[in-house]
Amino acid sequence: MARVKGGVVSRKRRKRILKLAKGYYGAKHILFRTAKEQVMNSYYYAYRDRRQKKRDFRKLWITRINAAARLNGLSYSQLMHGLKLAEIEVNRKMLADLAVNDAAAFTALADAAKAKLGK
């Protein structure tokens, strides 16, 4: 039986990894072993940061809502509690958008929350 040489398969495998590593800095897009390590790390970072992004945006929204709430004489937690008591269901993304782009609407929501809190 003839000996099977894996040249074609190996070259295809290496080319696939090096293609994925295109644009990486230094030897990481040239040398197969370092490119392979970097591609594996890149997949790990992408997986991790897709989840981290959700947390980061929520933090950003809360920060923006808190800043706008304090301009209206409430803390973030007081505003959220007041909105819940007033049975106003607005998610944090929409509240943050209102805080940045439509201050009058946000003030109206803050006033409704204040009324329910008795302030």
Curated annotation (Swiss-Prot):
<keyword id="KW-0694">RNA-binding</keyword>
<dbReference type="GO" id="GO:0006412">
    <property type="term" value="P:translation"/>
</dbReference>
<dbReference type="GO" id="GO:0005840">
    <property type="term" value="C:ribosome"/>
</dbReference>
<comment type="similarity">
    <text>Belongs to the bacterial ribosomal protein bL20 family.</text>
</comment>
<comment type="function">
    <text>Binds directly to 23S ribosomal RNA and is necessary for the in vitro assembly process of the 50S ribosomal subunit. It is not involved in the protein synthesizing functions of that subunit.</text>
</comment>
<keyword id="KW-0689">Ribosomal protein</keyword>
<dbReference type="InterPro" id="IPR035566">
    <property type="entry name" value="Ribosomal_protein_bL20_C"/>
</dbReference>
<dbReference type="Pfam" id="PF00453">
    <property type="entry name" value="Ribosomal_L20"/>
</dbReference>
<dbReference type="InterPro" id="IPR005813">
    <property type="entry name" value="Ribosomal_bL20"/>
</dbReference>
<dbReference type="GO" id="GO:1990904">
    <property type="term" value="C:ribonucleoprotein complex"/>
</dbReference>
<dbReference type="GO" id="GO:0003735">
    <property type="term" value="F:structural constituent of ribosome"/>
</dbReference>
<dbReference type="GO" id="GO:0000027">
    <property type="term" value="P:ribosomal large subunit assembly"/>
</dbReference>
<keyword id="KW-0699">rRNA-binding</keyword>
<keyword id="KW-0687">Ribonucleoprotein</keyword>
<dbReference type="InterPro" id="IPR049946">
    <property type="entry name" value="RIBOSOMAL_L20_CS"/>
</dbReference>
<dbReference type="GO" id="GO:0019843">
    <property type="term" value="F:rRNA binding"/>
</dbReference>
<protein>
    <recommendedName>
        <fullName>Large ribosomal subunit protein bL20</fullName>
    </recommendedName>
</protein>
